[in-house]
Amino acid sequence: MEDLKISIRSIIVYELIMIIGSMIMSSFDITSDNKLAQLIGNSIIQLISSGYIVYIIKKFYKLENIGFSKIKNDKLVWFVPYIFILIPMLYKFIEGIYKNISYFNSTILISIVLIFIGTVIAGFSEEIMFRGMLLNTLKGKIHLISAMIISSLGFSVMHITTIFAGKTLIQALVNVIASSLLGFAFVPLAIILNNILPLAIFHTLWNFIIIASSTMGINISKVYLFCNPINIIISIILWTIIIKKQKKSTFSKNKLVFSEKLINSI
């Protein structure tokens, strides 16, 4: 159970750093007018919290234990819908930058760099924590479906903490709902793909395009609106497949337990 304590403690400490950092920024009124100062502050907080996760990984984990095992290339077909969403978003985003780059000042360019760094660090950290450390630890100890549910809910509930970053309660709840849809789709994807790298890349690029385009006033493809419906469809299909496979697995001490053969058969 020690590894489970480590993963849970790591998530809690990560979140506490983010919350305390956001509260400090709010107390100094950093988030009110100066957007660049806000981005710099957020980047520092993110670097500290993610630096802690890197420390934990180096001390306690191997890459395969946090979701970076050999990817199942034949299962990438399940990830294709997300690629179809990302490509037009990325195209419109790059097109918008190209058309407006002559109007960008140094502040905007620095902001883009900070947003990119922040979204890369946050995207990979969140995937490693919930679809890497927590999911991989739990699925070896409890019912696989229970492990998936805990990982999904943990990821979504974590986003309520955005209220400490200046979001209203309604905005935070909307964020939780959107994160829930993504979480319940990405957990079975992580299991089927046997690797979280595609998920972390999508997570990073999605956040970067959404945040950067809003900051720069660039219109992106409306195809992003299909993400939630796709999350729902992928969730229903993959959860159904895994649950059916789980029912066929073996019982041990009257409790259905995780089986490598089960995962490999999906």
Give the location of each predicted region.
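Hydrophobic alpha-helical transmembrane segments
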Residues: 8-12, 77-79, 112-113, 145-150, ...
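Alpha-helical transmembrane segments in multi-pass membrane proteins
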Residues: 10-59, 74-79, 113-114, 118, ...
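Membrane-interface helix/loop boundary segments of multi-pass membrane proteins
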Residues: 12, 125-152, 191-195
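Functionally important transmembrane alpha-helices
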Residues: 171-229
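Structural signal for the C-terminal ends of transmembrane alpha-helices
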Residues: 55-63, 91-94, 237-247
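Juxtamembrane helix-loop-helix connectors linking adjacent transmembrane helices
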Residues: 30-40, 61-128, 135, 140, ...
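Aromatic-anchored segments of alpha-helical transmembrane domains
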Residues: 15-24, 85-93, 152-161, 204-214
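C-terminal membrane module of polytopic membrane proteins
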Residues: 204-266
